[in-house]
UniProtKB/Swiss-Prot annotation:
Catalytic activity: N(6)-[(R)-S(8)-aminomethyldihydrolipoyl]-L-lysyl-[protein] + (6S)-5,6,7,8-tetrahydrofolate = N(6)-[(R)-dihydrolipoyl]-L-lysyl-[protein] + (6R)-5,10-methylene-5,6,7,8-tetrahydrofolate + NH4(+)
Enzyme class label: transferase
InterPro entries: GCS_T, GCS_T_bac, GCST_C, GCV_T_N, GcvT/YgfZ/DmdA, GcvT/YgfZ_C, TrmE/GcvT_dom1
One example GO MF annotation: aminomethyltransferase activity
Domain of life (superkingdom): Bacteria
Protein name per the record: Aminomethyltransferase
Function: The glycine cleavage system catalyzes the degradation of glycine.
PANTHER family: AMINOMETHYLTRANSFERASE, AMINOMETHYLTRANSFERASE, MITOCHONDRIAL
Biological process (GO), any one: glycine decarboxylation via glycine cleavage system
EC numbers on record: 2.1.2.10
Family classification: Belongs to the GcvT family.
Organism: Escherichia coli (strain SMS-3-5 / SECEC)
Subunit description: The glycine cleavage system is composed of four proteins: P, T, L and H.
Length: 364
């Protein structure tokens, strides 16, 4: 039977259509996915993300451990509360998960990992942490609410006490701070400003209701997916998995190659892939009628006249832009246009960078 987050009852009271999402009963929408999408782009919306897993790591060798575990380098984290996005790779360079790591003190870091990969993530982390003497605490006592949109921070701040408002004042993106019983982070999955707020399970329902009263619109998985796709953000299991290199998933920027003597899991495989070349992730735009969908083939002819085929990893109609967009994994050599096979029709598409909307505006 699927698990329920501490906010399950609030979702049903708000009229949510609930679905099983990787073993969790989660809201798909509360009546209109499109309205929820636009609320985040123009005002403020919120998502229950309590199904994600918060993992606290403690021990004198925690930084050393994470420099080995992750492709990005936590040596970059020197200011308390600073966060970093990274892939956690296997020995062949495939992506076990993508995650966020927060630095608090030399012996205290926090990871936030995906729900779909929870068990394998915890097994992998535990296995590799043992030689470093790391104490691992899974924070199942915490719920998490993502408040996103141009007015999200201001509306959320009406629920904060003076000390909490002071703690987040001027906080830059990709930071987190523990302020009273709230862990408030300037992170998100929508391409908008906002907070991801972790708080004790028993306080989550009251906080959710207070956000509703403050004018924050409840949003479901449907809007979360169209928002993240417009923002060009990867979804685990679609843009990347254990068989796909981060180099083929527009995650090359998350790999810290320097210093050259840092050994991290998957490094040797990645160096070989970098030398020989990999597929790459691109954006696709189709302004003609129709919708680009996952797993549709993408065909193009390179400059030498050779024909190639890639695949759409995520596709949707973009509510913000008013036409269809997609992310696609394709061989090297793609130009400015390609063809997507939709049923029996060959549809022309424009090839773009893999990001379409940021802060409510189209990315040229």
């Amino acid at each position: 039977m699927a698990q329920q987050t501490p906010l399950y009852e609030q979702h049903t009271l708000c009229g949510a259509r609930m679905v099983d999402f990787h073993g969790w009963m989660m809201p798909l929408h509360y009546g209109s996915q499109i309205d929820e999408h636009h609320a985040v782009r123009t005002d403020a919306g919120m998502f229950d993300v309590s199904h994600m897993t918060i993992v606290d790591l403690r021990g004198s060798r925690t930084r050393e451990f994470l420099r080995y575990l992750l492709a990005n380098d936590v040596a970059k984290l020197t200011k308390s509360g600073k966060a970093l996005y990274s892939g956690m790779l296997n020995a062949s360079g495939g992506v076990i998960d993508d995650l966020i790591v927060y630095y608090f003190t030399e012996d205290f870091f926090r990871l936030v990992v995906n729900s779909a990969t929870r068990e394998k993530d915890l097994s992998w982390i535990t296995q590799h942490a043992e030689p470093f003497g790391i104490e691992i605490t899974v924070r199942d006592d915490l719920s998490m609410i993502a408040v996103q949109g141009p007015n999200a921070q201001a509306k959320a701040a009406t629920l904060f006490n003076d000390a909490q408002r002071q703690a987040v004042e001027g906080m830059k993106p990709f930071f987190g701070v523990q302020a009273g019983d709230l862990f408030i982070a300037t992170t998100g999955y929508t391409g908008e400003a906002g907070y991801e707020i972790a708080l004790p399970n028993e306080k989550a329902a009251d906080f959710w209701r207070a956000l509703v009263e403050a004018g924050v619109k409840p949003c479901g998985l449907g809007a979360r997916d169209t928002l993240r796709l417009e923002a060009g953000m990867n979804l685990y299991g679609q843009e990347m998995d254990e068989t796909i290199s981060p180099l083929a998933a527009n995650m090359g920027w998350t790999i810290a190659w320097e210093p050259a003597d840092r050994d991290f899991i998957g490094r040797e495989a990645l160096e070989a892939q970098r030398e020989h070349g990999t597929e790459k992730l691109v954006g696709l735009v189709m302004t003609e009628k129709g919708v680009l969908r996952n797993e549709l083939p993408v065909r193009f002819t390179d400059a030498q006249g050779n024909q190639h085929e890639g695949i759409i990893t995520s596709g949707t109609f973009s509510p913000t832009l008013g036409y269809s967009i997609a992310l696609a994994r394709v061989p090297e050599g793609i130009g400015e246009t390609a063809i997507v096979q939709i049923r029996n029709r060959e549809m022309p598409v424009k090839v773009t960078k893999p990001v379409f909307v940021r802060n409510g505006k189209a990315v040229a």
